[in-house]
């Protein structure tokens, strides 16, 4: 959890927001996936949000569903994902690493065992996409036992009770949704979210990162101007992977230029 605190403190001093890319571990295969992650970091990613392939990703649109399918087609298992995470952590000791999971994968070998494994490989946070705040107690308690930040989603229509719960239970960062629905770059994130960000700050929530539909540098700078601590982009990044499956080098080059432009916008 300290990695998030250190990151946000450093960014604050430099008056920048965080740019956080999302990819699915093992898409399109383990070797290329590790190269993709190195490229994202080298190009300026401040933290990583990583998915573990899952057969029924309810919160995700077609782009990220296809990423899951490609990882499955490559035979990627959760056990291999944890091996990848250990390698990433060894190579990049300071970057915050977050997992975006679904409850079934957490339940598989028992909730406590899952978070213990996360701690072992150097994961900093876990967001369980299909567990609402009011059902989150066993997850967040196990997370905190193992020094993992439990991440909660704050939807654009959050009422005061939900804002207070998210602020109270969340650690690391708060995932602020630009809009309702599923992920996807084609559904552009609607701003402004000033009022939610102000309330979250008032209730001492973990810093808000805006996600869902973030696909352009303008949206990153708008999120930072609205008071968010940064932005998360998933589908736009995964589309670059999808578009360049036949040319892995071109894929990495395009990812590098996209991430560096998005990171530059966080300094606005």
UniProtKB/Swiss-Prot annotation:
Stored Pfam families: Trp_syntA (PF00290)
Presence of keyword Lyase: yes
Keyword field contains Lyase: yes
Residues of the active site: 49, 60
Gene Ontology molecular function, alphabetical: tryptophan synthase activity
PROSITE patterns referenced in this protein's UniProt entry, alphabetically: TRP_SYNTHASE_ALPHA
Gene Ontology annotations for the cellular component aspect, listed alphabetically: cytosol
Catalyzed reaction equations: (1S,2R)-1-C-(indol-3-yl)glycerol 3-phosphate + L-serine = D-glyceraldehyde 3-phosphate + L-tryptophan + H2O
NCBIfam families for this protein: trpA (TIGR00262)
Quaternary data: Tetramer of two alpha and two beta chains.
HAMAP family: Trp_synth_alpha
Name listed for the protein in its UniProt record: Tryptophan synthase alpha chain
Lineage: Bacteria, Pseudomonadati, Pseudomonadota, Gammaproteobacteria, Enterobacterales
């Amino acid at each position: 959890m300290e990695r998030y605190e250190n990151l946000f403190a450093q960014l604050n001093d430099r008056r920048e927001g965080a740019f956080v890319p999302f990819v699915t571990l093992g898409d399109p295969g383990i070797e290329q996936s590790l190269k993709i992650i190195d490229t994202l970091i080298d190009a300026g990613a401040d933290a990583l949000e990583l998915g573990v392939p899952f057969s029924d990703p309810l919160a995700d649109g077609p782009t990220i569903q296809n990423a899951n399918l490609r990882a499955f087609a490559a035979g990627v298992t959760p056990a291999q994902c944890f091996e990848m995470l250990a390698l990433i952590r060894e190579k990049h000791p300071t970057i915050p690493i977050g997992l975006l999971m679904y409850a079934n994968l957490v339940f598989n070998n028992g909730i406590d065992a899952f978070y213990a494994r996360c701690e072992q490989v150097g994961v900093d946070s876990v967001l369980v996409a299909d567990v609402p705040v009011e059902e989150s107690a066993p997850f967040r308690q196990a997370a905190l036992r193992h020094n993992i930040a439990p991440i909660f989603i704050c939807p654009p229509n959050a009422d005061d009770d939900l804002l207070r719960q998210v602020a109270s239970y969340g650690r690391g960062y708060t995932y602020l949704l630009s809009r309702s629905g599923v992920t996807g770059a084609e559904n552009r994130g609607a701003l402004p979210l000033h009022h939610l960000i102000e309330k979250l700050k008032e209730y001492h929530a973990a810093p808000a990162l805006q996600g869902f539909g973030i696909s352009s540098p303008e949206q990153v700078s708008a999120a930072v101007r609205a008071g968010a601590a940064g932005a998360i982009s998933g589908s736009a990044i995964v589309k670059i992977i999808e578009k360049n499956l036949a040319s892995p080098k071109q894929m990495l080059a395009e990812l590098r230029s996209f991430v560096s432009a998005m990171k530059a916008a966080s300094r606005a």
